[in-house]
Amino acid sequence: MPLTREFKETVQARLRADRKYRKELLREGVECLLAGDLDTGKAVLRDYINATIGFEELSRRTKRPAKSLMRMLSPSGNPQARNLFEVIHHL
């Protein structure tokens, strides 16, 4: 079931305002990836990126096209571990 727009906006607002919440959400995304829950980990990282630096800034930092980064973290994306670690490094 897709989340309502209001919920996503609420989470994004909290991420922008609360440093501890940002840190914990990023940690949760990484823990999901390490536990093998790739779908949840990618979704959490996507939300984190959208609410913080955005894909354009991540693209600048990683020197990878923003569309490639979005595709990598999409539900059908199948990123290599080194690419995920590179993204996490720049967050």
Model-found features: residue ranges?
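Short basic helix-loop element that most often maps to the first helix and adjoining turn
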Residues: 42-58
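Recognition helix of helix-turn-helix/homeodomain-like DNA-binding domains
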Residues: 63-80
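Juxtamembrane/interface motifs at transmembrane-helix termini
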Residues: 43-45, 61-62, 89-91
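DNA major-groove recognition helix of helix-turn-helix/homeodomain DNA-binding modules
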Residues: 81-91
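N-terminal flexible/basic segments that precede or flank functional cores
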Residues: 1-44
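Short coil/turn segments at secondary-structure boundaries
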Residues: 27, 60-61
